[in-house]
Amino acid sequence: LDRRRQRQMCIRDRYNSMPFHAVSWHKSMERFGLNISPEEAYQYEGMRGVETIKLLAKRQWNKELTDEEAANMYEEKSNEFRKCPKAEKMDGVEELMRKIKTDGLKIVVVTGSGQRSLLEKLESEFNGLIHHELIISSFDVKHGKPNPEPYLCGLKKAGVMPWEAIVVENAPLGVRAGVAANVFTVAVNTGPLPQKMLADEGANLIFESMPSFRDSWNLLSENWKNR
């Protein structure tokens, strides 16, 4: 390992928006006759929306939806989400990102979202921390999480190898994707799911909240530099 090379941090969660997404999934899919409770929605966090819908349709209707059919249904979910209040930044995430930036790491955002308004907001609200050329969205990949493609794409954009990166995830499917990409994966449990679900997907480290990870960053960073 050339320790002079630029290293990379892939971060998934920046806003505390999942409670709104969960309710939006429930309300919108109910109109089509698909059942997904707000609690269940957390299990699919990080997956591309159209893939979530196709999976639900296959399980509940035994029907293979086309990409166009799923995209039309996802638009209903997006419209429902737009009615929700503005999501605040995840507690502790901006301070964490500033520490990461100070340590000289590239920050790559990997999101399953395809909402252009969110992608534009990321760069403006995290000024100097997030850059559009280092955002991986649903537009950049054919296969979303739990497939490793989003993180492999992030590695390629940053120009680093898997052992030169850390994935920060808060969803089981995202953890699975990070592990499958052979990247050291930190799970931060920001939702209601039991920590065992994150552990079962192979997370290398698990923190109970974003502030606890932020407060532990200096120690983790020092250990990582000395690998």
Question: Predicted regions span which residues?
Answer:
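Conserved SAM-binding loop
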Residues: 14, 89, 107, 167-168, ...
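Single conserved hydrophobic/aromatic residue that forms the stacking wall/gate
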Residues: 1-7, 11
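Conserved phosphate-coupling serine/threonine residues in phosphotransfer and NTP-handling enzymes
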Residues: 13, 111-113
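A metal-dependent, Asp-based hydrolase signature
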Residues: 46-81, 91, 99
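Conserved phosphoryl-transfer catalytic core
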Residues: 22-43
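Asp-based, Mg2+/Mn2+-dependent phosphohydrolase catalytic module
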Residues: 68, 94, 98, 114-227
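Anion (oxyanion) recognition and catalysis
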Residues: 30, 101, 179
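Short, acidic loop-to-helix structural element flanking the phosphoryl-transfer center
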Residues: 82-109
